[in-house]
Amino acid sequence: MNLEELKKRQEKIRNFSIIAHIDHGKSTLADRILEKTETVSSREMQAQLLDSMDLERERGITIKLNAIELNYTAKDGETYIFHLIDTPGHVDFTYEVSRSLAACEGAILVVDAAQGIEAQTLANVYLALDNDLEIMPIINKIDLPAADPERVRTEIEDVIGLDASEAVLASAKAGIGIEEILEQIVEKVPAPTGDVTAPLKALIFDSVYDAYRGVILQVRVMDGVVKPGDKIQLMSNSKTFDVAEVGIFTPKAVGRDFLATGDVGYIAASIKTVQDTRVGDTVTLATNPAAEPLHGYKQMNPMVFAGLYPIESNKYNDLREALEKLQLNDASLQFEPETSQALGFGFRCGFLGLLHMDVIQERLEREFNIDLIMTAPSVIYKVNLTDGESMDVSNPSEFPDPTKIATIEEPYVKAQIMVPQEFVGAVMELAQRKRGDFVTMDYIDDNRVNVIYQIPLAEIVFDFFDKLKSSTRGYASFDYELSEYRPSKLVKMDILLNGDKVDALSFIVHKDFAYERGKLIVDKLKKIIPRQQFEVPIQAAIGHKIVARTDIKALRKNVLAKCYGGDVSRKRKLLEKQKAGKKRMKSIGSVEVPQEAFLSVLSMDEE
C-alpha cells in the first residue's frame, strides 16, 4: 500500500471499547456486533464468544481484555474497520480496563435500563474520561418488563454529566438497536490520530505465551508501520527481536502483511523469555527508533497479599513457571519466594483484590494442575519502630517484636457503596462493624443512595463483599480505592497448637476485637483439626499473653474392656499406664493441620 492509501485507510479506522457494570450486557452486545458485521459465521457463534477462558464463562464475568477487528459497511456505502476491545467490569480488574482504554479513541457505555447506573459504571467512566475518550451512552435491556429508559437517561445526565439525548435504546439479547449503535460508532468515534510516516511506536497492551512461537505481543500501533522481517526494539530494556509475523484477531489470529497507524493486532517475534516484555511498554524499530516511549500505564500496586504453597513440595518449580506465565498477561500479579515452617516452600503473592486472588488460584489449579494451600490474605502495614526506623510488612509472620513497635499504620480505602434506600441502614451497620468511618451520602434518584465510607482495607479484604451482598439481597454495588494510611491499635495474634506456633496461622487484628477473634478462631480450629491420640491444646496469644484456649480431647481406647469385675486397683493400674503412654506421645507428637484450618482464620465472622 502506498502512503495515500494508508492515510485513507487510517481515516476509516474506529477503535472503541465497551464499558459497563457486571451483568449489564456487555459481552452480549459484543456478540451481537460480531454477528451483525458477519465477523463470525453463525456456525462458530456461541454466547459470550470473547470470554474465552472457561473460568470467565462459568462465572459469567470478563477477566481478560480481548481485541477484535471487524469490517462494517456503513449506510454511506464506505467500509469501516472497527477494533472492538472488550474490557472487564469488575473492580479488581480496573487495571485491565485502563489498559484497554489506552488503546482506544472511543467507548460505548452500556447501562442497564432496569438497574441504572452502578458504582462500577462510574469508576470505568472516570477511567475513560482520564483517557480523553469519546463516550457514547447506550441504554440496554429495554425489552425487560422493569425497564425504565427515561429514568436511566436522566440518571446518566445527572450522575455522570454526559449528554444522553442521543443515547441508543437497545436490547443486545433481542438484537434491537444494534445497527444504530454501529452507525453512531462511525459518526462519533474519532479516527486514530497518528503519523504513518513517523518512526514506529506501538503500545503493548497485552501479551500471551505460545509454546511454539514464544511471547506474542498484542499492540495498538500509534505511529508508523510494522511488517514481518522488521527488527523491533522494546524501549524499556532496548532488547531487539526479528518480527516473524504480524496480524489481527477476528477472534482467531489471522496473519497480515503489515500493521499501520491505528491498527490493533499482534506481533510474533520469537521472544523467548517472559521477563523481556512488560505490558505498557513501547515497541519501535531498531533501525529507526522513536525518540521517546509512549507514556504507558501507571504501575498497579497490589493491595492484598497471601502465601501460595504447593501441596506436593516437589511442584515448587512448576508453581514458579506457572506464576511467570500468568504474570505475562496479568502485569498486576507480583510474587516472591518465601518459606514457612508449617507449609514448606512457596511464594508470597500480591493481588489487586479478592476476586483477582480467587481467579489466579483457580487458574493455577486448572490450567497448570497444581494443588495449592493459600494462607490468609493480608495488606501492607507500615510499622514504625521505637528507634525511629519504619518498615512495610505484608506478612504477619514477619512482624517485629511487639516491644520494638512504636505505632502501626494500616491502609484505609474510600469505599463507594450504591444501594437502594431501604438497605441504607443495613449497609451502615455493616460498615460500622468493619470499623468504617462515615464520610457522606448522596441521593442518585428517589430510591438509590450513594454512601461513602473510609474503611480499613484489612476489613474489606476477606468477606466484606459477600456480607454486603447478603445484607442488601444482592442490590448493592461497590467500588473502592486506596486513600491513606492511618495509625491504628493493631496487634499480631499467634495461634499455638500443642505449644508450638503455627506461622501460617498468624494474623493482624485490632486490639479491641482481639479477644473475641481469638476465641472464635480457637473454637473453630477445634472443630476442624481431627482428634489425635493425645490431648492438643489450641491457644491464641498476643506476644506472651494467652487470650483464649481450648483443648482437643484425646482419642482413647477403652483399656478396661477386658476386666470383667475384678479389683479396682487392677483397673487403676491399666488407666495409669494408658495415661503415661499418652503423655509420652504428647511430648513427641506433631499435629497435622488440614487446609480448611488456614481458610477458617479468614472467614471469621459471627458464625
Swiss-Prot record:
Subcellular location: Cell membrane
Domain tr-type G positions: 11-193
UniProt-annotated binding residues for GTP: 23-28, 140-143
A Pfam family annotated for this UniProt entry: GTP_EFTU_D2
EC class of the enzyme, as a word: hydrolase
Family annotation (InterPro entries): EF-4, EFG_III/V, EFG_V-like, EFTu-like_2, G_TR_CS, LepA_C_sf, LepA_CTD, LepA_IV
Protein name: Elongation factor 4
